[in-house]
Amino acid sequence: MNKFLNKKWSLILTMGGIFLMATLSLIFATGKKAFNDQTSAEDIPSLAEAFRDYFPIGAAIEPGYTTGQIAELYKKHVNMLVAENAMKPASLQPTEGNFQWADADRIVQFAKENGMELRFHTLVWHNQTPTGFSLDKEGKPMVEETDPQKREENRKLLLQRLENYIRAVVLRYKDDIKSWDVVNEVIEPNDPGGMRNSPWYQITGTEYIEVAFRATREAGGSDIKLYINDYNTDDPVKRDILYELVKNLLEKGVPIDGVGHQTHIDIYNPPVERIIESIKKFAGLGLDNIITELDMSIYSWNDRSDYGDSIPDYILTLQAKRYQELFDALKENKDIVSAVVFWGISDKYSWLNGFPVKRTNAPLLFDRNFMPKPAFWAIVDPSRLRE
């Protein structure tokens, strides 16, 4: 017997204004409260298949997820993979010249065996990067150097290390990976000039960005696509700083093919319209757009509470309706969005269970038992929802 969604809207007055909150009771078709009682796991439609006429559907993966029950989830529901951590600099080259390929290779092999596309994340970042990159020849932090001549020597050394690293990585994977996050999270509106004040920037200015893209193109050739990736790209201030950076780089002939919009959002913010506005703005530069790290926290950013194992039905329903709104908008803009990649596949292993605080979060389409949530049905088969 099917169970359905019932909605009841209550108007809540606050000192700050009036807002509408859905007091919703969801009885859906999955898991304990959301599955049609007659539906088996084998009858659940493929997420990737549902979007075959729009764009590939991807998910971040760890090497340990390539076997077992969770591996079956990836095989059925996505046709694109990205390494959540295994291809970051600290994982691939913990010390200079000491490359550790095994975990990344395992993900590449899993993708090839299952006919999946791959994205690379990420060649350059301010986090999860060995400190050795920015140490001088004597092992001292380059950022602490004050002598102009030595600073110039350090700049050249850092950029040479960057080129060497990129060349080694790209040459290894260019035949298997066609979509590359070259630089990640270089914009920080609160830092001087809007550029993140990382060691990369302190030592080279924006030159490291240019060098990274040129080195990647040189090693990988014209068949691979190169992206600049960041979070909160919907925020008008951050978006415009990123836009001007990319525009200036393109004018200098830097080979950038697209923008990666991480899209770590929550069930309340940001408005979907802002996400689409940003995508359209970068498309105006002739660039591709990818949703690269999609998830949707059930908590607002400033909320540090924890539902534990008792997430209210109305919260899951809000999430479902918001995912539906987002995907409807993305489908309408399929000509300028080439892929949508989730940052994980099951709530059980989401990074948001530990960030910004340790708690139970549920940002993805599959629950801790690997069963589809209301959000899954909202974007795959909205007929399962009833007003």
From Swiss-Prot:
GO biological process: cellulose catabolic process; xylan catabolic process
Active site: E185 (proton donor), E293 (nucleophile)
A Pfam family of this chain: Glyco_hydro_10
InterPro entries: GH10, GH10_AS, GH10_dom, Glycoside_hydrolase_SF
pH dependence: Optimum pH is 7.0.
Keywords: Carbohydrate metabolism, Cellulose degradation, Glycosidase, Hydrolase, Polysaccharide degradation, Xylan degradation
Top-level taxon of the source organism: Bacteria
Pathway in which the depicted protein is active: Glycan degradation; xylan degradation
Its EC number(s): 3.2.1.4, 3.2.1.8
Domain GH10: 41-382
Thermal dependence summary for this entry: Optimum temperature is 80 degrees Celsius.
Molecular function terms from GO: cellulase activity; endo-1,4-beta-xylanase activity
Reactions performed catalytically: Endohydrolysis of (1->4)-beta-D-glucosidic linkages in cellulose, lichenin and cereal beta-D-glucans; Endohydrolysis of (1->4)-beta-D-xylosidic linkages in xylans
Family in the record: Belongs to the glycosyl hydrolase 10 (cellulase F) family.
Protein's job: Active toward xylan, carboxymethylcellulose, P-nitrophenyl-beta-D-xylopyranoside and P-nitrophenyl-beta-D-cellobioside.
Protein name: Thermostable celloxylanase
Lineage: Bacteria, Bacillati, Bacillota, Clostridia, Eubacteriales
